[in-house]
Amino acid sequence: MLRVYTQLERGNQWLKQYEGRSPIFACVLGFTETGLIPNVSTAGATPADRSLTALADAEFLFNGPQSQPTYPLPDLAQGVSPAMISWPIYTSQNFPFQLFNAGLRHSPPVPTVDLRGQAARCLSSGMALPLPIVELLFQQGLEWGETLAKQAADGYLILAECVVGGTSTAQGILTGLGFSVAGQVNSSHPVCNHQQKHQLVEAGLAQAGQQDWLAHPLALVAAVGDPMQVVVAGMMITASRTCGVMLAGGTQMLAVYALARQISQIFRLPWTPDNLLVGTTRWVVEDPSGDTVALANQVGEVPLVATQLSFATSRYPQLQIFEQGFVKEGVGAGGCAIAAHLYQGWQQNDILNAVEQTLEDYYRLRDPN
């Protein structure tokens, strides 16, 4: 049900250590105007849809299927929101759950911890966020990482994200940190929009001017990042000192890991790399139009683990389409599937049945006739 793709010894040791332990599930919401660019993401069929995706996902993650949500899940080009995977798992297994608002355009319709951030401009501007906001969000991340780690006790944290356009800002961070990532990142598209991402990143870094980004990683986030990245980086650093941390995502969380490592070096912040893992889905890792394993190896140190969950036998075409490379990941879907297996031994059919039941309830409530 699980496979370790990089750093095999460290990855298997982490999985063994946290087998049978209950995690705390935290999802950090953010927004970047990068997500409004035509065709940049499939997390919403139109830019108008994508401007509300994080709000709809947050509402679904908190409430599950409802007859009249404030923000209905947006119609996707293909497939369904990955919140359809995360919600039934964390609620069935009673993971404590917390939503964090790192920077959204609108107030979420459900309870969140407001970190006093703001939505980011498009990364191509080279001025995505004001530096003081980035510094504030990082400090908030450090403090909340400590708090969540205390609550986790001998368990671990699942740190997830919801940022439409977030793989593009991830490419911006990785490029600024000196990694050669062309062709390696993923997206919600079945075939990754590499050229579009590359042009956005090059424009953003050019607008920001020549800087020593390795010496100024927070300034790099201010230039081409998004508000989620620096929050999760802060959480990761402090939480890793005392408990396990699963960064739940693919490209975006590899970028967060690389960012956090650089920040910790520059600011001499102690952290514990052995307590960290990146957890995602097979759909991300096996995406032929990206190369997550090569990216993880290039970033180095952190184990990359993926659930082997498949929707090939689902009775719903909206789930089968995941096998063609649509959607792939988001809001901790892969991390929750990994945790479901670790904590209660859930197998393929357990997860598939839970997700299909959620989808059935969703459609029944949405269209009772």
Swiss-Prot record:
GO MF assignments: nicotinate-nucleotide-dimethylbenzimidazole phosphoribosyltransferase activity
Supply the name of the protein: UPF0284 protein AM1_5137
Which family is this protein grouped under? Belongs to the UPF0284 family.
The top of its lineage is:
Bacteria, Bacillati, Cyanobacteriota, Cyanophyceae, Acaryochloridales
Check the record and name the PANTHER family matching this protein: PTHR38811, UPF0284 PROTEIN SLL1500
Highest taxon in the source lineage: Bacteria
Identify the SUPFAM superfamilies for this entry.
Nicotinate mononucleotide:5,6-dimethylbenzimidazole phosphoribosyltransferase (CobT) (SSF52733)
